[in-house]
Every structure is written in structure tokens, then in C-alpha cells.
Amino acid sequence: FLSFLIFHTVFSQDYYVYVAAESDDQVSVLKFDGKEIIETDRISVGIMPTENEGPHGITIDPSGKYWYLTLAHGSPNGSVVKYSTENNEPLSKVELGLFPATIQISKKTGLLYVVYFNLHGLMKTSTVSVVDPEYMVEITKIKTGIMPHGSRLSPDGNFHYSVAMMSGELFEIDA
């Protein structure tokens, strides 16, 4: 009997996943109840309806109240947009540079780390932006390698990692 209760408790929880469709300027919210997956919401994102702005990276803050989305292609620059998880409405945004791609939020500091995967022009050294999500302002840019992609924080939130695709370098940033 106890096994059934544990099984039921574990598998009766609903899980939500946010999925960005980069070529369609939409984000789908998927709900998994332990048995099936259904789309509960489809959110149109971007600023200009006639331009593909490319939603790319998504992260949810530790409180679960907000989610953040990078619009990688932008006009002329990309941005990070802050949304409410309650109604999936945009709350604020910060314009960044060319092609902000992957994004993570530190559970320790609450800061956002945004990696630039610049596909425009010559391959050159890129950056990771540190953004204050409360005020949606860029605090600093940290120089990395050429075309960094991927963004991960250590489980304790102390370090941010990204890899520069063109140089094969791994960058560790004190978060």
C-alpha cells in the first residue's frame, strides 16, 4: 500500500516545459502529467511581426515566477525578454548585442548569464553578458572565445561554463 502512494505521488505531479521554435517566433508550453504531453499555451514572441527574431534560449528563475527568453536575431541587436509564468505575458526586456543565444540563471546570485553566438560577419572573440533580472539591465560583458555556445552553471551556482566552438576552449566564469 505504501508503494502505491509513493508511486501515485511521484507520477501525479504535473511538469511544464517551455520550448522555443526559433524559426517560427513562438514558444510552446507543454504539460506532462506522468501519462501524456499536451500543449497548454503557444506564445507569439518578438517585437516586429514581419521579422523572424529567433527565440533561442530559455530559462526559468528559481522561484518559478518568471521565465526569460533570448531573441537571438533582433533588429539590429538581440535581446532578453522577461515573462510572467502566471500568464506568459512579457514584463520587460533588455537589448543586448548580436545573437544572444543560450541563457542560464544562477540560483546563488539570481543573475542571468547570456552567451553570444555571433554568426554575423567575421569570426571574432565574443562575450557573455551578465544581466540583473530584477531591473533587466546588463551589468557587464565578459570576454570569451570565438562563437561560444552552450551555457551551464555549476549545481551550486558558483561557476558559469561555456565552450567556444571555433577554438575549442572551455570558459569558466566566477558567477
Placement of each model-derived feature along the sequence:
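Bacterial N-terminal signal peptides
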Residues: 1-8
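Predominantly soluble domains enriched in secretory-pathway, periplasmic, or organellar proteins
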Residues: 8, 12-175
